Amino acid sequence: MTRSPLHRLIFGGLRRLLYLWVRSETINQSSMTLNLDRSRPVFYALPSPSLTDLAVLDHECTKAGLPRPVLPVAVGPLQEPAAFFYLTPDPDWLGRQDKSGAPPTLERLVAAVSQHAEEDAQIIPVSVFWGQTPASESSPWKLLFADSWAVTGRLRRLLTVLILGRKTRVQFSAPIHLRELVQHNKGHARTVRMAQRLMRVHFRNLKTAVIGPDISHRRNLVKGLVHAPLVRQAIADEAQRENLPLAKAEAQALRYGNEIASDYTYTVIRFLEVVLSWFWNKIYDGIKVNHIEQVQGIAPGHEVIYVPCHRSHIDYLLLSYLLFRNGLTPPHVAAGINLNMPVVGNLLRRGGAFFMRRTFKGNPLYTAVFNEYLHTLYTKGFPVEYFVEGGRSRTGRMLQPRTGMLAITLRSFLRSSRTPIVFVPVYIGYERVLEGRTYLGELRGASKKKESVLDIFKVFGALKQRFGQVYVNFGEPIRLAGFLDQQQPGWREQDHGPQYRPDWLNATTTRLGETVARHLNEAAAINPVNLVALALLSTSRLALDERALTRVLDLYLALLRQVPYSPHTTLPDGDGQALIEHVRSMNLVAEQKDALGRILFLDEGNAVLMTYYRNNVLHIFALPALLASFFLSSSRMSRELLGQYVHALYPYLQAELFLRWAPEQLDEVIDQWLAALVEQGLLRQENDVYVRPAPSSRQFVLLTLLARTITQTLQRFYMATSLLINSGQNSLSAEALEDLCVMMAQRLSILHGLNAPEFFDKTLFRHFIQTLLQQGVLHTDTQGKLGYHDKLGELAEGVAKRVLSAELRLSIRQVALHRDDGLESSTI
């Protein structure tokens, strides 16, 4: 457009039109500060084609008294129609750019200077930045359109000018003298490449300083994936299996790579930081972080894989936000393909999310591309985040680990263990989770709704509620090499080829998942809502006098301070009364006043919701509650008998709640808890016998409330064992037993007013049955029917009668005896 007088006239008109809106400023704008030789021709190099950048450059050159880029210039006999060129060619309308080849102007300049020893040309690299630096910009809207490393199309450039044009900055850099490069006598082609390389490095370094580092690997990595040997083999297999041309199979692999890969952009990270800072302080009362210093210590020199628990969709953003705010590199986050929605998906991808399908089954090409993508992230040292639970917990409990991502990680480490991998568990605790009401609907049988862009606007409906604080605790790291040394001592000497899949992989991956889950539970952040829910849900009427509730909460705090669950577990500040006031301010408890004081209770709307928050910390109280349960039906019990019964039930509690202690550590922990219960007056010790308080005493009420914490879990155990025994040997399959357990639990919840949907959660029964099989209490015959060991009867009656009331045991046995009637009536 600037190569003729007419073009320059049109260009001048466009520049004046542009400056009706744009305002620009420059750094190093004079020939003195640039150290220019005004007797030598000056050229300007812009990194990529942009008419608006050229107009801004021309305006600033005129203002600073520098030679204009749109005017002709001569280098010896060479006449150039304009004094500028672009280092890379023009992108198409889709933003695609071919960076091969050299600018023709640069080719001619090098030739002219080489052929005429007295000539020189000064090339000034010029960078134009639209808007403030991302680090100083506070407007999330402007950050979305701020300069980034991604190649952009014309439409986005237009929006950038309109939104950010009032704060445009031009950076003139020190000139490159072509004469100095030519004097190296490297030949024409190498001199041109040398000049290009100097300018590319310069532009990159300057851009890094201004807008932040290029943390995206997408543009190069995706193309590299299809050339990896394992992916090449998968492409060939796909072409043969589906009878496709090799090019089509390769194109499919490339599409998979683009579907999967994240596209980290510093400006989007800053955008999310600004938006989330508002979010955490507007909807929540901020974030409380514990133990992050250990991550800051191990991050250098390690491949860090963050494995948080999964409670809410905002978990995806929370950890990245915290790490960025604390000077750590935000991770690449595994997200379900269901979140790859219009607008939101692109924003998440540029914030570091990579997307994965729910199942890889039947698609070996996709599997190969995904595995290679993760392997590349690991070997290049990019931090990664994924959720071992798979989906969000709807009950507040830790879900059984899904081991797929762990298996991919383990196999990748066996392929290349040069960079040590460390798993960092991250416990995320909410005083009120955004999706709480949705979870309750799903537990009650409502179908899971597909995610939608419109779900974002539901957040604004929550602004009227108070959501309390968010707690983030970093747990004890798990070094993968050390874990493998314990599980498979000879793993380093084995032949670890790219396709290596050892026989011990599945079992070791399962144990790794269980270890991660235990470490997550060890890092639990106990908050006021958890403790109030625990106390009120243990009462028969979901209500307590305020003074009584205060005593219960003070007791729980005292017990937890005396016997901490783990060094990474955290407790709330304040006493029981402070906890009550905090929960009241969130409108999670109702109250009624009378002449004797205030009664706090859970109304129908909040009663079920509060089971979610109780379940967050159920594992913390499992062992003391179990010990307390033995004294509901027995006034005294020896230490030996207590230990015997706890050891009998512990494997099942540990499997469901991911309790941290190994069986050989159990006796020591039992003694610690018994000592704490004695100190708090809930038990009395007489030599080797423990005695409960008088049934009419306040201490007995407190002991009973503590015991009821674990009652529903023990009831489920008793239901399953009663159904098995009443059905007889080899009469039920595991699936049939699950269905019967769910039906019985639903009936009992009505008969006994157990308003907790997870009481009849099928997955809990399924896992209990699996644990019985693992413990050798159950076995399956050739028809898949369940047989049981004699000790099942001991577990069902000998132990159950010690921890469950006679009324409950009778009710469960009656329902079990009449299960056929129940099945028949349920189908009418």
Curated annotation (Swiss-Prot):
Alphabetical GO biological process terms: CDP-diacylglycerol biosynthetic process; fatty acid metabolic process
UniProt GO molecular function: glycerol-3-phosphate O-acyltransferase activity
Reactions catalysed, as given in the entry: sn-glycerol 3-phosphate + an acyl-CoA = a 1-acyl-sn-glycero-3-phosphate + CoA
A GO cellular-component term linked to this record: plasma membrane
One Pfam family per UniProt: Acyltransferase
Enzyme class: transferase
Pathways involved: Phospholipid metabolism; CDP-diacylglycerol biosynthesis; CDP-diacylglycerol from sn-glycerol 3-phosphate: step 1/3
Keywords associated with the record: Acyltransferase, Cell inner membrane, Cell membrane, Lipid biosynthesis, Lipid metabolism, Membrane, Phospholipid biosynthesis, Phospholipid metabolism, Transferase
Major site of localization recorded for this protein: membrane
Motif (HXXXXD motif): 309-314
Highest taxon listed in the record's lineage: Bacteria
Topology of the protein relative to the lipid bilayer: Peripheral membrane protein
Keyword Lipid biosynthesis tagged: yes
InterPro entries: GPAT/DHAPAT, GPAT/DHAPAT_C, GPAT/DHAPAT_LPLAT, GPAT_PlsB, Plipid/glycerol_acylTrfase
Protein localization: Cell inner membrane
Enzyme nomenclature, EC number: 2.3.1.15
Alphabetical list of NCBIfam families matching this protein: plsB, PRK04974.1
Stored PANTHER family: DIHYDROXYACETONE PHOSPHATE ACYLTRANSFERASE, GLYCEROL-3-PHOSPHATE ACYLTRANSFERASE
Similarity comment: family membership: Belongs to the GPAT/DAPAT family.
Domain free text: The HXXXXD motif is essential for acyltransferase activity and may constitute the binding site for the phosphate moiety of the glycerol-3-phosphate.
Protein name: Glycerol-3-phosphate acyltransferase
Organism of this sequence: Pseudomonas putida (strain GB-1)
Lineage: Bacteria, Pseudomonadati, Pseudomonadota, Gammaproteobacteria, Pseudomonadales
Gene name per UniProt: plsB
